[in-house]
Amino acid sequence: MRSNYLRLAITAVLLSPAMAYAEDPPPASNEEDTHGLPSGSDWKLDFSAGWGFFGFGNSLYANSHDEVQQDLSDNWMEGFVKGGFSGTHKLNGAGEFYGAISGVGERTYNAPPPLVGGEASSFDVEDLYLGWRSGDMLGLGENALDFVVGRTQYKLGHGMLIYDGGSEGGSRGGFWSGARKAFEFAAIGRVKAGPTTIEAFYLDRDELPESDSSSATYGVNLEYSWNEDNTLGATYTSWTANGLRPERDGLDVWNLRAYLTPIPSLKALSFELEYAKEDNGDLLDSSAWNALVGWQLESAWKPKISYRYAVFEGDDPNTLKNEAFDGLWTGFYDWGTWWQGEIGGEYFLSNSNLISNQVRVHAKPNESIGTGLILYDFHFDNTASAGVTSDNIGAELDWYLDWTMNDHFTVSFVASYFTPGRAVEQAFDRDDDFYYGMIYVAYSY
């Protein structure tokens, strides 16, 4: 399925300077103080940490992130510390080099071992990359060419398919914190020409040692953004994996995205559309799509109301093919995206064999506080593959609040309620409601 010509094209782009997509790349600096480094060099210390308290009432669910089956404990704590350095070195009229090195330590307390990493801790390298970007050379526009290689991040769109380069929980701890975002190895190139961006990439995920499928992908991404409110995207990726994920080895994925505010005189109205097709013969033939419409009110607290409908195909056991959508490397872009539900999406539902309706209301009482409510209605796409006769999984209501205390500290609160539907009753013989709460403190410097 994979063309040799496509491989050559990707290799050619990667070998040419192109733009990286690492999180928070070191900005260009014109400061005279070079901290004792050669002229044109600058560096800074990077430090962040987080600590959370989590509690379940009537806990049940298992970790769909890494296919681990285990009930949750009622209460647990987890935290992380990340420290490192990042820097740049300007080249006379030839752009600049940039890079970073960092490490992450994580710890989880009082949770059963397989799920969120009970009494588990780890420390390892996180960022370790070197890149080059063109600056304003050749008159092509600021950083029109960029290339980066090493342990770095890459994020595609709003994260439905590719967003998180590192697995959490299990033997590493830090299940919810998500401090590990860098891929184990990445080579990323980007060329920007006006509103058009072309990327080529190779990504090898940093998976948990106990469930390492050696999953990797290479691909190309094209985006066209005619302003900050309107972007169209198209991506092709080809995948490899070992025997733990046979359906992923040889998989081809096509993805189309649109983030639109189509009426210039009505910027309060916005749309998001995304479609993905997965093809690996009889091993996997599936699709997923979602559509969102949002309305931003021009009033106190600036409330935004949105509705999203999402479908992730499930397997039909009556066919020879496997139609169960592979959620790949999804991640947290915003509350509700793409872990769907602070109970369901975090702890027992995956983006496969799932239909979800989401209604969200978000408000900002002031510049320091963002808060909202998210209501979900979950259904199975195919009941037979789930081993039940009802498609009604249940409904969930989440409340969240992010309080930015100052430039360094942010505190997040979550309270969630899940009422199980008939499908959960049939699968687990449980019909009690579920409750969940969280307080998380994050620090960055």
How should each PLM-predicted stretch be described?
Residues 79-207, 215-219, 223-226, 231, ...:
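Outer membrane beta-barrel
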Residues 22-147, 187-193, 256, 263-270, ...:
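Beta-barrel outer-membrane channel/assembly domains of diderm bacteria
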Residues 245, 317-320, 383-386:
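Short, well-ordered secondary-structure micro-motifs
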Residues 318-353:
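Flexible glycine-rich, low-complexity coil/linker segments exposed to the extracellular/periplasmic environment
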Residues 1-35:
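Cleavable N-terminal export/targeting peptides
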Residues 206-208, 241-242, 314-316, 380-382, ...:
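A short local loop/turn or secondary-structure capping micro-motif enriched for an aromatic residue
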Residues 50-52, 152, 203-205, 237-239, ...:
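Active-site beta-loop-alpha junctions enriched in small/polar residues
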Residues 191, 195-264, 268, 273:
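Internal metal/ion-chelating core segments
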